[in-house]
């Protein structure tokens, strides 16, 4: 054991004096030990015995061995503490730290076996400097882009229409904004509305090419809603949104049809623009309605026809020709040729016919199969109406009134340029669910302030 008196300094302190007299005092205590002194130890003997049993080579432990190890450990701890306390006093501190023990181990060779157990802080690699963490907003919102198609081709923030690119104003997209691109007559006017904390809805209105009021044929063009999601990494993902339009049972035509057109399973959205209509009326131009169609896939049409044929027991009424005398203003009666048993206008449903309708003549509402009110058809059955309209004028003048009788529906009041147009559709609900009233989808005139059209359901 070492009996050095200190770190070599001339000046002696309390710790150095205690260290110099440490070993002579310890030797004196060992010589004066008695049997009673071995019974009481400062360190627990049971814990020392448990540590000794960790060695697999140790089979048995005598009663004197733990006592000797306890006494030796006590002397070792006392000497190491005194040497560490000297380093504490040199640093003018009153608290013993881990670094003090490490310095005492490195300065004395007898403690070399503890270097790996208690390494010096200086030998440690420098601590990693705390990186400046970027402020991350909680749950950074994802940008959503919704495209509302008012024309046969979808118009986005930067899209193409009629084969020519429609350039819209470039806007700076902030996180948490919902941008809705919607074409409208007039100039491009971005409108921003605050909808919630940290979220904005921006409506961008793009001016289409050419005459926007000209009726567009929906051949090969469908209305599709694409949802573009920009992730936190900057990648843009386009996810198509499936429209739950259901199966259409009644189709209401409220616009002029040029030539011969067969309407089969199509959803038509009617929209009028009062400002453009007034401008054309003042210039002597006829007013036209904007028509958009949503094509239903051929598979859904075939499935609907099969279900309809099963529901009507093979008796499928096909309307071949219908002359709309209300649009031409002629006094000719409305004639409809149907392949089936036509019954006079004695339907139990509240139906109002135009003045030109003759009593007993076949009509669309009367050609429908009579259904009992007590036994309604299955909710999943489909009724497809195939109408071929011909002999209609190519234009709808502003001073004409439009009457469109529908099966099972009361007559509507005359439509005016400033009046809202609705799309009437009856959706077939799944089995076990009934739709009490039809849905009314309002396609309102786009006001000058840039607000989006409203959708109401009664």
From Swiss-Prot:
Bias-annotated ranges (Polar residues): 339-351
A cellular-component GO term for this protein: protein-DNA complex
InterPro entries: Histone-fold, Histone_H2A/H2B/H3, Transcr_DNA_Rep_Reg
GO molecular function: DNA binding; DNA-binding transcription activator activity, RNA polymerase II-specific; DNA-binding transcription factor activity; DNA-binding transcription factor activity, RNA polymerase II-specific; protein heterodimerization activity; RNA polymerase II cis-regulatory region sequence-specific DNA binding
A Pfam family this chain is assigned to: Histone
Compartments in which it is found: Nucleus
Compositionally biased tracts (Low complexity): 305-315
Superkingdom of source: Eukaryota
Main location: nucleus
GO term, biological process aspect, one: regulation of transcription by RNA polymerase II
Region (Disordered): 305-379
Record keywords: Activator, DNA-binding, Nucleus, Transcription, Transcription regulation
The protein's assembly and partners: Heterotrimeric transcription factor composed of three components, NF-YA, NF-YB and NF-YC. NF-YB and NF-YC must interact and dimerize for NF-YA association and DNA binding.
Protein family per UniProt: Belongs to the NFYC/HAP5 subunit family.
Stated role: Component of the sequence-specific heterotrimeric transcription factor (NF-Y) which specifically recognizes a 5'-CCAAT-3' box motif found in the promoters of its target genes. NF-Y can function as both an activator and a repressor, depending on its interacting cofactors.
Name of the protein in question: Nuclear transcription factor Y subunit gamma
Upper classification of the organism: Eukaryota, Metazoa, Chordata, Craniata, Vertebrata
Gene behind the chain: NFYC
